[in-house]
Design a protein with these regions (language model features):
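Transmembrane-helix exit/juxtamembrane "anchor" motif
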Residues: 70-92, 205-213, 288-293, 325-328, ...
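Membrane-embedded alpha-helical bundles of multi-pass integral membrane proteins
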Residues: 54-61, 65, 118-343
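Reductase modules of NAD(P)H-dependent flavoproteins
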Residues: 10-51, 310, 435-439, 444-449, ...
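Histidine-anchored nucleotide/phosphate-binding helix
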Residues: 414, 491-506, 529
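Ferredoxin-reductase
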Residues: 357-459, 518-519, 550
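Non-transmembrane, juxtamembrane loop and terminal tail segments
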Residues: 89-127, 353-380, 554-581
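Extended, low-complexity, polar regulatory segments
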Residues: 2-39, 82-134
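Alpha-helical transmembrane segments of multi-pass membrane proteins
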Residues: 21-38, 74-84, 150-169, 244
Length: 653
């Protein structure tokens, strides 16, 4: 029990209690103090019992909710370390121990076949793109199932632990027919409000680039963006229901009107509540893809999103500061995320600058190549070496162009293999198509500089931040067959995988193939050195390269080969289309056929499909890979039906 000297800020929501008649105050975590014993009429006292009991239960349930989240992360993190993925070094050790050039994996155990069969069955059902694409976007069924589980879990905690009833109570100084109607709508509205507060730090976690979730689970931060978006929508619905509940109570159920409403709506906590709701609605409207594309632009949306989100959290504290135990962690997580980004950038660019012979900060100077393409967008390639640790294949960096805006950075995946040379430098190579905004501005700068340079080469400075993302070749042992499917500049995602594979020891039973769709035959020049290396080293591996030119007339049937019996074949397939015609499904490679034929020709082992390209291509890949997975066949030992998809599914606007 507390003395009666409790600060007024704690008593501002008195809940029909008369503190002047209180003998003691009972504290309730996250809520107003309660007067004990109750000095109101019996109906009001019964109602207050329900209110405070429901709130205490709600705080307990938020604890259970967060304990569930942390428990899942703990089990996941321990599982990743207790049962790590098999790595190529395991194959090397097997070779050394058996003196065999190609390691023979032991027959899968009962446990291994069980896990493989379950994983394959889950991919078969949960990998395809979810229905209602106009609502959920290009997300998988798995993400939709996770969202449904989260929503159901929150729905349960929204309703349990509340005594539902109705209490009609008299009003002092009013006629007998003027009464207050008290219902469980109030406790329920408070419950959904508390849950909205409790979800706030989780929403921040889902949005973090320096993601704690990624560090624990190994899942790239981009995969959590769908949950960040929909957690925000859940918070919006909870806030609307919370507000609607108390508007009905204060504006209709409580009497006399409009006196009760007028007195309530001018209270500071109510004003801050309306401000927070307004900001939340604005955040929701500004997140629409149409608004971002046609009104705000992505960079303005991103920066405005940060500002409005922080002001929104501040308004929540102003609305009900007793629940800031949920909000302060959200602010801390956001600040730590930003500071970690600065630290990453500093680690890459601060220190002794060997070329300049000084200590300090220095950007990276990249050699730029330019391909003019007025129809589909100009293309730029950047090449430079930077002193740093090697990243993992599949990770990406955020690049800030010093000749553009210092307040913007864009994610790009290096197409180069991350290898440290004898002086500690790692080569970076990037390709991007200038669709608009900052990339178009940089492409124009490079084009103008090339016109002025007589030697036909130019440079531009970049500032790196990263790396981010997952190691996409984790567990890619020599018995895993590899199919790479790319569209346009998506080749940067799959090229490092292939470059690594062709430098490994040969496994004659392994199947490797690249399917690449480009707009023009000229686009092959983007990665000409890398393609030449694949042709030269891939012959021994039986690498097959199939390139589809989809938007220009080229003599069909072009075929070049290198090597002898184990040769690299490169097929350039084209569909004749007139200039200016719209794209059609027939112009692109049939992804479903490519996957089916690849899996059908696998001799042994599982298959991993790497994909990067437009959303439509990724959608087709998901469907095709899901169809080829079969838990029953994997259980019987047919490993080729254990097909895993690894794709670049970063958010595009």
């Amino acid at each position: 029990m507390e003395s009666l000297t409790t600060p007024n800020s704690i008593l501002r929501r008195q809940h029909i209690q008369n503190f002047s008649e209180a003998s003691q105050l009972e504290p309730h975590w996250g809520y107003a103090y309660r007067v004990v014993p109750c000095t109101n009429d019996p109906g009001s006292c019964a109602y207050l019992d329900v209110v405070y009991d429901a709130h205490d239960a709600g705080m307990l349930y938020t604890g259970i909710f967060w304990a569930t989240v942390l428990g899942i992360l703990l089990i996941w993190g321990i599982g990743r370390r207790v049962f790590p993925a098999r790595e190529p070094v395991d194959d090397l050790l097997a070779q050394l121990s058996t003196n065999e050039s190609t390691p023979q994996r032991p027959k899968p155990s009962f446990l291994s076949r069980s896990f493989g069969a379950v994983a394959s069955s889950l991919r078969h059902h949960l990998l395809p793109t979810a229905p209602l694409r106009t609502i959920f976007g290009h997300t998988t069924r798995l993400q939709l199932v996770i969202l449904a589980v989260l929503t159901s879990y929150l729905s349960i905690w929204s309703f349990v632990g509340i005594v539902y009833g109705k209490w009609v109570t008299p009003i002092k100084g009013q006629p007998a027919d003027v009464v207050n109607t008290r219902t469980s709508l109030g406790p329920w509205a408070d419950r959904v409000g508390v849950l909205a507060y409790a979800l706030t730090p989780l929403s921040v976690l889902f949005a973090a680039r320096e993601s704690i979730l990624s560090a624990v689970t190994g899942v790239p931060y981009t995969s959590f963006m769908f949950l960040h978006k929909w957690t925000g929508y859940i918070i919006l619905v909870q806030s609307l229901l919370h507000t609607l509940g108390w508007v009905l109570i204060e504006g209709w159920l409580y009497k006399p009107q409009p006196d009760v409403w007028n007195k309530w709506v001018v209270q500071e906590y109510a004003i801050w509540g309306f401000v927070a709701l307004g900001l939340l609605v604005l955040l929701w409207i500004c997140s629409f893809q149409w608004v971002v594309k046609n009104i705000t632009g992505y960079e303005f949306f991103r920066k405005a999103h940060y500002v409005m989100a922080m002001v929104y959290i501040g308004a929540l504290i102003g609305h009900w500061e007793e629940l800031q135990c949920f909000l302060v962690p959200g602010i801390v997580l956001w600040v730590v995320d930003r500071l970690a980004r600065l630290v990453r950038m500093g680690m890459l660019h601060c220190g002794y600058q060997r070329k300049e012979g000084r200590w300090g900060f220095s950007s990276a100077e990249a050699e730029a190549k330019f391909w003019k393409d007025e129809r589909f967008g100009d293309v730029v390639r950047l090449d430079f070496e930077h002193h740093q640790k090697a990243w993992s294949i599949g990770q990406h960096f955020f690049l800030c162009f010093t000749e553009g805006s210092l307040w913007q950075s864009h994610p790009f995946t290096p197409l180069s293999l991350p290898q440290i040379n004898n002086v500690g430098d790692v080569k970076h190579s990037y390709i991007f198509r200038a669709k608009g905004g900052e990339t178009r501005k940089i492409a124009r700068v490079i084009e103008e500089k090339l016109k002025e340079q007589k030697e036909g080469r130019t440079t531009t400075n970049v500032v790196l931040q990263g790396p981010y993302g997952e190691n996409i070749v984790e567990g890619l042992t020599q018995d895993v067959n590899v199919l790479c499917v790319a569209g346009g500049t998506g080749i940067t995602y799959v090229l490092p995988v292939l470059l690594r594979l062709v430098r490994e020891k040969v496994n004659p039973d392994r199947k490797i193939e690249l399917v690449w769709a480009v707009k023009r035959k000229q686009d092959l020049e983007w990665v000409e050195p890398e393609l030449e290396e694949l042709r030269r080293l891939g012959a021994a591996h039986g690498l097959q390269i199939r390139i589809f030119v989809t938007a220009e007339d080229v003599a069909p049937g072009v075929r070049t080969t290198t090597g002898d019996e184990k040769k690299v074949s490169e097929d350039v397939d084209t569909k004749s289309v007139s200039v200016g015609s719209d794209e059609s499904q027939n112009q692109r490679p049939d992804v479903n056929v490519a996957v089916n034929e690849f899996v059908a020709n696998v001799a042994q082992g599982s298959t991993r499909v790497f994909g990067s390209g437009p959303p439509s291509m990724i959608t087709e890949l998901r469907e095709a890979v899901a169809q080829r997975n079969s838990g029953s066949k994997v259980w019987k030992g047919e490993g080729r039906f254990d097909v895993r998809l690894v794709c670049d599914d970063r958010l595009e606007w």
